[in-house]
């Protein structure tokens, strides 16, 4: 079963060529009302084909959970590509009721519209308790072998700090097997505005290297499925000369658009990022890891040998252990890889004075 394409005229949000069945909303507060949505279905179709994700799923049993699709451009694209058994759509904006109800009808009920906001965590409990979302839970053995083959999460995230906070929480929950992580190694696809994109993808040597980007590298396998040249240029500008010379700084998108990837209603330049949970490392304490990353990233330009003192009295005695594990302790903290942070954390877990890591107040650097 294939759904008809949604053309720009039918998806535009108050644009100059809009047919008028949608109206300008009163954008407010922390909600998906601040989410822009993709209007170019051809681009979405092409990104999915290039991703080759179809082979990763059992379509006959697959559930797609989609947040803030707007009029359903991405809903149509995802449904046509994966042909899932169930496609649950979280969209609270009443203005999109007609196009979403139409998709529910055309899909013979396989698309289910839930009139709730995916920005709020209570929504996910509601759809789970009501059995609207009822995927199989992976066993630990299955998680060692592959990501979840029957559940995919897709979302347009809000712009500004709200979007950054949401993607940071997604990473926290997937790493701890909370939220959708309770079902196993769940893959997420996110259309992100430019600011959260740069924060999420900025790797070692990036001037604003964040806890969010370290968590992405440490706990997920990630790819950029689609990005514009302008977003890639902004990302490149944030790297030091040393990082550009010594490390792979480009996310190597599968699809690069020469023009901004247009969204409505905010005309934002979007990037499509894929993240999939890695198998859990039972030897790692995630709270200790998070504390260490937050503390050390407050002094990105300082060498590890000097910033180690922030981790507790006598922590410098651990430096030889770091060196033995291949970590360059004279390297600025901002150049450490996620693997370096993981190694440091496992060593410090055995350190008797690490308790203070959970008690200090560290400025949020997500």
From Swiss-Prot:
GO terms for cellular component: chromatin; mitochondrial DNA-directed RNA polymerase complex; mitochondrial matrix; mitochondrion; nucleus. It is found in: Mitochondrion. One of its GO terms (molecular function) is RNA binding. S-adenosyl-L-methionine binds at residues 38, 91, 117. Belongs to the class I-like SAM-binding methyltransferase superfamily. rRNA adenine N(6)-methyltransferase family. GO terms for biological process: mitochondrial transcription; positive regulation of transcription by RNA polymerase II; transcription initiation at mitochondrial promoter. Gene3D superfamilies: Ribosomal RNA adenine dimethylase-like, domain 2 (1.10.8.100), Vaccinia Virus protein VP39 (3.40.50.150). Keywords: DNA-binding, Methyltransferase, Mitochondrion, RNA-binding, S-adenosyl-L-methionine, Transcription, Transcription regulation, Transferase. Transmembrane segments: none annotated. The keyword Manganese does not apply. InterPro entries: KsgA/Erm, rRNA_Ade_diMease-like_C, SAM-dependent_MTases_sf. It comes from the Eukaryota. It is an enzyme of class 2 (transferase). Mitochondrial transcription factor that confers selective promoter recognition on the core subunit of the yeast mitochondrial RNA polymerase. Interacts with DNA in a non-specific manner. Its EC number is 2.1.1.-. This is Mitochondrial transcription factor 1. SUPFAM superfamilies: S-adenosyl-L-methionine-dependent methyltransferases.
């Amino acid at each position: 079963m294939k759904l008809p394409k949604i053309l720009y005229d039918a998806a535009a949000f108050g644009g100059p060529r809009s047919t008028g069945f949608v109206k300008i909303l009163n954008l407010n507060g922390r909600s998906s009302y601040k989410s822009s949505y993709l209007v170019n279905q051809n681009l979405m179709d092409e990104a999915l084909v290039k991703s080759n994700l179809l082979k990763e799923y059992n379509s006959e049993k697959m559930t797609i959970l989609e947040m803030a699709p707007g009029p359903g451009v991405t809903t149509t694209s995802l449904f046509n590509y994966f042909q899932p058994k169930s496609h649950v759509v979280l969209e609270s904006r009443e203005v999109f009721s007609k196009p979403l109800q139409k998709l529910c009808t055309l899909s013979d009920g396989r698309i289910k519209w839930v009139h709730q906001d995916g920005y709020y965590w209570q929504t996910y409990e509601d759809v789970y308790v009501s059995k609207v979302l009822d995927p199989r839970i992976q066993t630990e053995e299955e998680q060692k072998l592959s990501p979840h083959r029957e559940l995919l999460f897709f979302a347009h995230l809000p712009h500004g700090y709200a979007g950054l906070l949401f993607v940071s929480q997604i990473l926290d929950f997937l790493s701890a097997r909370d939220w959708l992580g309770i079902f196993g190694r769940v893959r997420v696809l996110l259309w992100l505005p430019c600011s959260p994109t740069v924060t999420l993808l900025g790797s070692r040597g990036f001037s604003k290297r964040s806890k969010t980007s370290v968590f992405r590298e440490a706990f997920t396998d990630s790819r950029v499925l689609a990005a514009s040249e302008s977003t890639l240029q902004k990302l490149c500008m944030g790297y030091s000369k040393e990082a550009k010379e010594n490390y792979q700084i480009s996310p190597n998108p599968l699809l690069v658009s020469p023009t901004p990837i247009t969204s409505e209603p905010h005309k934002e330049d979007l990037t499509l990022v894929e993240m999939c949970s890695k198998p859990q490392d039972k030897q790692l304490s995630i709270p200790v890891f998070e504390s260490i990353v937050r503390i050390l990233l407050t002094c990105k330009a300082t060498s590890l040998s000097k910033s180690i003192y922030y981790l507790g009295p006598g922590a410098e005695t651990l430096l030889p252990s770091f060196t033995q594990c291949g970590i360059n302790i004279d390297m600025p903290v901002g150049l450490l890889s996620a693997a370096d942070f993981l190694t440091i954390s496992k060593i410090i877990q055995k350190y008797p004075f690490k308790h203070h890591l959970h008690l200090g107040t560290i400025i949020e650097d997500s």
